[in-house]
Amino acid sequence: MLLIFTDLDGTLLNSDDYGYEAALPVLKQLQTLNIPVIPVTSKTRSEVEVLREKIGLTDAFIVENGSAVFIPISQRNLASPQTQNWGDYDLMQFGFSYTEARQGLKAVAEALNQPLTGFADLTEAEIHQLTGLAPEDVKRAKDREFTEPFITPKNFTSLEIEQTVNQLGFQVVVGDRFSHLIGQEAGKGKAVQWLIQQYHNSQPDAKIITVGLGNSPNDLAMLEVVEIPVIIPGKKCPHPGLENRGWEVASASGCQGWANAVREICNSLNIYLN
């Protein structure tokens, strides 16, 4: 059994226009072969649900930087005693609630003695201006359940922000424009490992091979826990934070690189894709 875990922005989706057209033929063949393609992303459930419908994904997905795994109720065999019913899904939650994330951001701001601006503090127009997201996508990006992105303060180093956040019992993914405050138990690697184990539990006699595709250091934890990690490069080269790891680097950026890499891996495993 093959499991494909993938980041979205800059990996399955182009970084500049969020396009995915070049990956559609491969995605369609994977669905025909019942090979799960599992998004692992900082995006919200609302954002991923729309994308899944557009590109035909039907399996579980991991949101908000590994804060939660959503399993469609049609795949209840992957649930566990720790999961809870969440509408159309079984939910495995690793992160805090959104209320706790907002309270945490306030505590971090007080500890840094620096006002911090979270997504909830921004209007939809301001988020559109900062991110370039379409208005309807801004609404979905604001529909957060477990984490709070905030504008990265420029007068502190990444290390200073991380140390302050950790002392308060949270984690932070520091980015150039936005950072993400997440729960102490959350993380892409942990969520991926948990879901892999659920597949093992549901099919104990099956040989499971895991693939992971990502383009940034935020994907490291995911890439480190799969058997076949693949780096999707930027337009010029891979991210410096992913260099010198001996991992496969896709032949192109974005969705074209994703499609090329997945096709090559499948063919090497005698799963022949066109």
Indicate residue ranges for each PLM-predicted region.
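Asp-based phosphoryl-transfer active-site loop
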Residues: 1-17, 192, 223
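Mg2+-dependent phosphoryl-transfer enzymes with acidic/Ser/Thr/Gly-rich catalytic loops
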Residues: 20, 179-274
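Active-site phosphate-binding/coordination module
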Residues: 20-118
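Anion (oxyanion) recognition and catalysis
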Residues: 31, 106, 110, 166, ...
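Residue-level detector of anion-binding/catalytic polar loops
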Residues: 36, 171, 228-229
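Short, structured coil segments at secondary-structure junctions
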Residues: 55-57, 64-65, 168, 225-226, ...
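Short hydrophobic/aromatic-enriched beta-strand-loop microsegments
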Residues: 58-64, 136-138, 229-234
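Conserved acidic, metal-coordinating active-site core of Asp-based
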Residues: 108-211, 217
